[in-house]
């Protein structure tokens, strides 16, 4: 492809598009630059593999630290496993693209977005979505796009398109909206307890901005004479379709109307499918349908699922009844328990239907904060939420692996939902980690993790501003007929058109994530879903607060105790000491852990009472300004003919002249004191070089008793 360039003016910024300069052997390489943020997005298609019955789409976002002028740490000095943020951006790019590919496409498709440079203003993620849409079309891959995305911020009650990092940090909303010609196709947001109406306005504002990027892409395609590539659906075996409908339709409908639990329903559906398979196998060897299934063994399963999907959707659309008997806006039974696990700092077990999540809270010190080594300006996290999804939670046998993209994404969503209600560091200096263990899954485990996290934090005594609950909303849409479902279970997620996760407090929304399986919905449908979700969230929150109405007034006995105080930043070196000698000695002497910030904030933690106070006293003694007349308890370190040296503060010595050892005349210093003796001394004078002269004279019994009693 010949090199093509174009520049788009978009909300006060230029977006420079270059197609064809880079990655000539990829299907297409698109290089986009906005400000000093630059990304390369490639799209490549490869002939499908035999036996694949799904779209093998792979989306990878690659961060290179050279983009920020940095060299990676570690022995190898190169990037290793993608950081969590890269995984989240990969998912963010994937989610608006996937619904727009023909569902029958079986070719391998890979999108790779590489950040080449970043500035401190333009986040690369939404730029990558634009680049992916351009690359897919330019590579002549079947795709029902174009698609584009924008970020919407809210600063001082004003919506901003594609805000800078600073504006995102200062604002109350961080919303990404993706859309295509048919409507909104993806939403992801974190918000500071925003009312539903404000969020809807933000989505509408963002969707209007998306239209400009869609028009710009159409102009690019017109310039390059690129037309959409059509991929007609593969022909169906009409005999198989008719056979499945004739022999299974009424039985499937009967199962769906029995309002069974997940396990019973799946067992009965599997029995119906097995009977179909047996009927076909009983046919003569030369029977066309039997031969067809020998060549296409997955087609019976595909047609059975398609019929089940059709009947479930008909039941919801025509009768307003779901497969478990619930109304469209009804939440499954909710139950909660807290404080189940001994020794941990906080725990909660949250049940909603057959979905069960155990959330456990751990409180740590500032030194336990997670250091982030990526291209984002934020370099550490004080709150971490980790989500685990073992095979047994869905009755499967599979080996345990490191967290996959789904687990990372669900964990991050639940984390985002709680961040707006966490106390400020000045009020609660602990680093907090919550782990949500999915013990049973039948839909919406991420929102169950939000509810479990809230209760676990409250059980741990974390003074959150308000409790947060979450619910997943679904959608069934056929033509103009639309039904919104509250608290979807697994089958409704799998066979439905939308998974819209909404989390928030009574005051407003804290996190959103909407994924579509169809090519977009209107903002009106989004608004209805949010309002219906509000009722569901409030119902769940009521159930949670029946168990634990407020954070516990005290931390768990096993939680570390923290003391926080400030010192002059110039004194930090004294506290650390050469090679960390002094701070290590404090830890060894007291058993407390010491964390030091660059601004002079000292946090001392201990699990045993008195340790933190002892460490604080030692630190305060280290940085205390020595003044004449102050009285100390010191230790004799060495003796010379004319006197003795006494360490009266850690690392600080002064000399007692022989004439200041006693009220009477002392002939030999050794006759009065010895090395390692503890002595009460007073600062007599400090000379121009900072040398301290001490005395044992003129100290009252009360002063001596005071320093002995308060010495750590």
From Swiss-Prot:
Q: Where in the cell is it found?
A: Cytoplasm
Q: Does the keyword Transferase apply?
A: yes
User: Where in this chain does the record put each S1 motif domain?
Assistant: 629-697
Cofactor(s), names only, from the UniProt record: Mg(2+)
InterPro entries from the entry? Answer: ExoRNase_PH_dom1, ExoRNase_PH_dom2, ExoRNase_PH_dom2_sf, KH_dom, KH_dom_type_1, KH_dom_type_1_sf, NA-bd_OB-fold, PNPase
State the SUPFAM superfamilies in the record.
Eukaryotic type KH-domain (KH-domain type I), Nucleic acid-binding proteins, Polynucleotide phosphorylase/guanosine pentaphosphate synthase (PNPase/GPSI), domain 3, Ribonuclease PH domain 2-like, Ribosomal protein S5 domain 2-like
Q: Name one GO biological process term.
A: mRNA catabolic process
The entry marks the following residues as binding Mg(2+), namely 493, 499
Domain annotation KH: ranges: 560-619
An annotated GO cellular component of this protein is: cytosol
According to its UniProt record, the EC number is 2.7.7.8
Its Gene Ontology molecular function terms? 3'-5'-RNA exonuclease activity; magnesium ion binding; polyribonucleotide nucleotidyltransferase activity; RNA binding
Instruction: Kindly state which reaction or reactions the protein catalyses.
Output: RNA(n+1) + phosphate = RNA(n) + a ribonucleoside 5'-diphosphate
Q: What is its main location?
A: cytoplasm
Task: Cite the entry's keywords alphabetically.
Answer: Cytoplasm, Magnesium, Metal-binding, Nucleotidyltransferase, RNA-binding, Transferase
The answer to keyword Amino-acid biosynthesis applying to this record is no
Which Pfam family, just one, is annotated for this protein? PNPase
Q: Which NCBIfam families match?
A: polynuc_phos, PRK11824.1
User: What does the record give as the function of this protein?
Assistant: Involved in mRNA degradation. Catalyzes the phosphorolysis of single-stranded polyribonucleotides processively in the 3'- to 5'-direction.
Similarity-based family: Belongs to the polyribonucleotide nucleotidyltransferase family.
Which HAMAP family does the annotation name? Answer: PNPase
Specify the protein name.
Answer: Polyribonucleotide nucleotidyltransferase
Organism of origin is Synechococcus sp. (strain JA-3-3Ab) (Cyanobacteria bacterium Yellowstone A-Prime)
